[in-house]
From Swiss-Prot:
One of its GO terms (molecular function) is tRNA binding. The keyword DNA repair does not apply. GO terms for biological process: translation. Belongs to the universal ribosomal protein uL5 family. Pfam families: Ribosomal_L5 (PF00281), Ribosomal_L5_C (PF00673). Part of the 50S ribosomal subunit; part of the 5S rRNA/L5/L18/L25 subcomplex. Contacts the 5S rRNA and the P site tRNA. Forms a bridge to the 30S subunit in the 70S ribosome. Keywords: Ribonucleoprotein, Ribosomal protein, RNA-binding, rRNA-binding, tRNA-binding. InterPro entries: Ribosomal_uL5 (IPR002132), Ribosomal_uL5_bac-type (IPR020930), Ribosomal_uL5_C (IPR031309), Ribosomal_uL5_CS (IPR020929), Ribosomal_uL5_dom_sf (IPR022803), Ribosomal_uL5_N (IPR031310). GO terms for cellular component: ribonucleoprotein complex; ribosome. This is Large ribosomal subunit protein uL5. The lineage of its organism: Bacteria, Pseudomonadati, Pseudomonadota, Betaproteobacteria, Burkholderiales. This is one of the proteins that bind and probably mediate the attachment of the 5S RNA into the large ribosomal subunit, where it forms part of the central protuberance. In the 70S ribosome it contacts protein S13 of the 30S subunit (bridge B1b), connecting the 2 subunits; this bridge is implicated in subunit movement. Contacts the P site tRNA; the 5S rRNA and some of its associated proteins might help stabilize positioning of ribosome-bound tRNAs.
Amino acid sequence: MARFQEFYKEKVVPGLIEKFGYKSVMEVPRITKITLNMGLGEAIADKKIIENAVGDLTKIAGQKPVVTKARKAIAGFKIRQGYPIGAMVTLRGRAMYEFLDRFVTVALPRVRDFRGVSGRAFDGRGNYNIGVKEQIIFPEIDYDKIDALRGLNISITTTAKTDDEAKALLASFKFPFRN
């Protein structure tokens, strides 16, 4: 069992039951999945960009991402339907908890001028989104072997009904909120 998974069962669940007064442990919000998405608009010019991004995401997530394709043609962006325009990976279970552990304890402190993550990036239904500007904050990425700095979006999906419950859940995982 992953370290954060044990931490969730032993510390987070009792803390949230006490804070919100849940009657059952099944009511306690939990993280269901973490989705990493890398949009690569510049990939229309060079196909090697997709391969490098897939390699980076594979190292970061620990599993192979799926290449996302354009749903419809947009002439203004010079893309046709079916063009590869990004890469995405969904983490669940053990891999999800291990990624969250690495992200909170190792990657976030490596962000330049880091003062904490925004407490307002919730979607109203208890899910949290965070954008990372550089993939080099992850220790798995070798700085000398990257071809370009790429950002990625990290979506944390929870079973929380409100943003307050989700924020309490993530805060109990030692998420460094600034406000």
